[in-house]
Amino acid sequence: MTSETEERDSTMQQDTTALMQLLTSVLQHDTVTALSFTDPWGTAVAIGAKKMETRSWPAPRKYWRGPLALHISGTLTAEAKWVCERSPFREVLHAAGYASDMRRRFMWELPLKQVIAIAWLEEAERISADFHVDEQERSFGNYLPGRYAWKFGAVYRLKQPVLAVGRLGLWQWTPAVSVWDEIQQMLDGLRAEGQVESHA
């Protein structure tokens, strides 16, 4: 039992450290590099269910190991509506508090035209025939050889999503003052918690 507790505490500490690294990096820039997603794929990343985003093109190396704002585009496509009702999307969306309006089929209450989270982009790896990915993660993307898996680390989900106009490819997002304040407050809180634990 002790070893399990120690392992859990170690994992939580690593998660906190990674989140602090993400938030600190965001505060060091005037803008944040952003990527637009179609939902529900973007929301799945924001809630931590989806760890990789598959694209036909790689993220340039200069953006690796840095923050990436997750923007949701303005429409819920027919394919997306269908996907929302299928496993594992349906389960992870419900678990995160999203629900469909049963009076109107497929009317999912998902964020649109908004930046909803900021993630740490680890790298973009070219997918090969022997690329390893678990079953659930594979169901979240298109892992055909030759495509690229954008791998995410820590993710900070904004308390209040921010309206924004997305673009193709990577683009620069200038957060509102309220976003900077929220991130600074979260970082200060994590630091305070760390100081308390270190003296416990």
Show where each model-derived region lies:
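Structured alpha/beta reader/binder surfaces that contact nucleic acids or chromatin modification marks
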Residues: 4-9, 13-200
